[in-house]
Amino acid sequence: RAGFLGGVTGHVYAVDGISFSIAKGETLSLVGESGCGKSTVGKAILRLFDITGGQVMLDGTRIDDMPAATLRPMRRRMQVVFQDPYSSLNPRMRVRDILAEPIRNFGLAKDSADLEKRVGDLMDRVRLPRDAVGRWPHEFSGGQRQRIAIARALITRPSLIVADEPVSALDVSVQAQVLNLLMDLQDRFGLSYLFVSHDLAVVNLMCDDVMVLQHGQVVEAGTAKEIFQNAQHAYTQTLLAAIPGYSK
């Protein structure tokens, strides 16, 4: 916080005192209104910026203070799916190249035939036709673009995926399809999700555990059943009351 003549009068933390763990194959949701710090937590875990205190552990290894060269192979084990599938995909690249680029960068394919097979397998996993790899991102619907983004996140076989409002930009009818896909992939590959959302109706469908943030701090945490059936904090109760047709 800046004071008179540019002096520092204090520090404001975007998030503070947050601690959690996510078991293999489970989903933890961070929920709260815009600006509460939930996306900041996801970015901190992904090491998109450095934290000023605390620790981030991935599969038992501390990564928050890890040098960039050491961190690179660890990045294979954590991926992200962003809110807006269109802005997260390069509009100048065909889908084949969007998926092939990280496969090449990580040296995952033995040869060109193996590369093509891997790209095709990814399309199968997200239930898109293989022959669509020659198309551009703008030729797909929003839900299809998000499937492509999910396919890209699967390339390195991560143990953790940070899903930052992954369906909030989609029509309600498409949201359910994408959420079902995420849950099916979780069952198949044992994925852990950090699911960032402001939509508690979606969270109730998707998540095992819930952490409610307000002004960068946790106000309530528990299993999804505990939160949705017996919320204790007034802020959580307000969020739940905003769900159309909500009842315990």
What do the PLM-derived regions correspond to, one by one?
Residues 1-245:
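ABC transporter nucleotide-binding domains
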